[in-house]
A protein has these predicted regions:
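Catalytic cores and adjacent flexible loops of soluble metabolic enzymes
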Residues: 1-273
Length: 273
């Protein structure tokens, strides 16, 4: 995601998401505005959003400065992650795994000290282009490192969009028993067509929480030839068809996505419905 969108547009999208029944929204990232100008308005957004008892607004962070900004905004839920592949991790954060893990350790401690829920994750869990995938056993060893921090949730991200349903099942077969009931979130990208099958495979394994974005917008500016997260409206449709009640109005989502597409005058939105 390289285009910078206005705060007004983001708040318009937020209103549509709330009207459709979405109850957990990652508003932005507290990262350096010169590196990611798309997120320069994070404070503005957190101060502008309507507050509801049943709505969670979270933020992505990478370091203690970002967490400090989140604390100042009254954020009660944050997400952070580190890359399993140092070629990507260094481009994204300027840190190799060991240093990033030390930073994550401090973040978890500080977040809990301030009564903030924190989700920790592994980027590139299913590999990156032109490098061999690490495999489920190796990924499990890194999951153990995350579990040692006692986070509130664990996330596995297919940052490069390379996972297949078979690979998803292979990973989850050994990871789910190991995390002992710790909530697991999956973060997929629709880099290749048919990727919703990955979410379907995870649903069959019992996973119920996935990252998504309206219309499939997004994607890492540090990863070449990737797309955004799965479109929220497509994920909700899949769950509806599986008999899983999300409490989200799919038609309301589609209406908001269509309005966003007209506003942007862009073909960037990738939802299938």
């Amino acid at each position: 995601m390289r285009r910078v969108y206005s705060a007004e547009l983001k708040l318009m999208v937020l209103d549509g998401l709330l009207r459709a029944g979405v109850r957990h929204i990652q508003l932005g990232s507290f990262v350096h505005p010169e590196i990611l100008p798309q997120m320069a308005d994070a404070e503005l957004l957190f101060h502008a959003v309507p507050q509801h008892d049943n709505v969670i607004y979270s933020a992505f962070i990478l370091n203690e400065r970002g967490l400090g900004r989140a604390i100042d905004c009254g954020v009660k839920k944050v997400e952070t992650s580190i890359s399993l592949h140092e070629s990507y991790g260094f481009k994204n954060t300027g840190m190799k795994f060991d240093r990033a893990y030390e930073e994550m350790t401090r973040l978890v401690r500080l977040a809990h000290r301030h009564d903030i829920s924190i989700r920790v994750g592994l980027q590139c869990a299913w590999g990156v282009a032109n490098e061999a995938a690490l495999g489920p056993d190796t990924v499990l060893s890194y999951i153990d490192k995350l579990m040692a921090l006692d986070p509130d949730k664990i996330c596995l991200a297919d940052t490069a969009g390379l996972a297949t349903p078979k690979m998803v099942k292979e990973y989850l077969d050994i990871i789910i028993p190991q995390i002992g009931g710790k909530p697991l979130v999956l973060h997929f990208h629709e880099t290749r067509q048919g990727g919703l099958a990955n979410i379907h495979a995870a649903l069959q394994m019992g996973v119920r929480e996935f990252d998504s974005s309206l219309g499939g917008l997004g994607g890492s500016p540090f990863m070449v030839n990737t797309t955004g997260n799965f479109a929220t409206e497509d994920v909700v449709k899949l769950m509806d068809e599986a008999g899983i009640d999300t409490g989200i109005d799919r038609l309301g989502l589609k209406k908001t996505a269509s309005h966003l597409k007209r506003t942007l005058q862009s073909t960037a939105l990738k939802s299938a419905i």
